[in-house]
Amino acid sequence: MALTKAEMAEHLFEKLGINKRDAKDLVELFFEEIKGALESGEQVKLSGFGNFDLRDKNERPGRNPKTGEDIPIKARRVVTFRPGQKLKSRVENSEPVDQ
């Protein structure tokens, strides 16, 4: 199961008592701020949670798995996430969930 933006907004509505529209707008604004910072080349640091970083990957050789043909994989910029120590500890110490 995955946590969705709609579920985040519902949790804000339930825990903070703000109306559902404001909760939805707050969640959207939060993610828009992260996207905007990353688009402008900034690192995003969320204390106690982790960091979103940008990495530039060089062009490299690849292979089409269907045909075996060699093809170049273009240089690109990717987003990486590194969890913070607090998040790592909480996840490591949590009980496994059966799927």
Curated annotation (Swiss-Prot):
**One of the Pfam families matching this protein, by short name:** Bac_DNA_binding
- Entry's InterPro entries? Hist_DNA-bd, Histone-like_DNA-bd_CS, IHF-like_DNA-bd_dom_sf, IHF_alpha
Keywords, A to Z, come to: DNA recombination, DNA-binding, Transcription, Transcription regulation, Translation regulation
Q: Could you tell me one molecular function GO term of this UniProt entry?
A: DNA binding
Q: Which residues form a coiled coil?
A: none
The signal peptide, as residue positions, is none
According to its UniProt entry, the protein's GO biological process terms are: DNA recombination; positive regulation of metabolic process; regulation of DNA-templated transcription; regulation of translation
Q: Name one GO cellular component term.
A: cytosol
Q: What is this protein's function?
A: This protein is one of the two subunits of integration host factor, a specific DNA-binding protein that functions in genetic recombination as well as in transcriptional and translational control.
Subunit organization: Heterodimer of an alpha and a beta chain.
Q: Which family does it belong to?
A: Belongs to the bacterial histone-like protein family.
Classification via NCBIfam families: himA, PRK00285.1
State the name under which the record lists this protein.
Answer: Integration host factor subunit alpha
Native species: Alteromonas mediterranea (strain DSM 17117 / CIP 110805 / LMG 28347 / Deep ecotype)
Q: What is the lineage of its organism?
A: Bacteria, Pseudomonadati, Pseudomonadota, Gammaproteobacteria, Alteromonadales
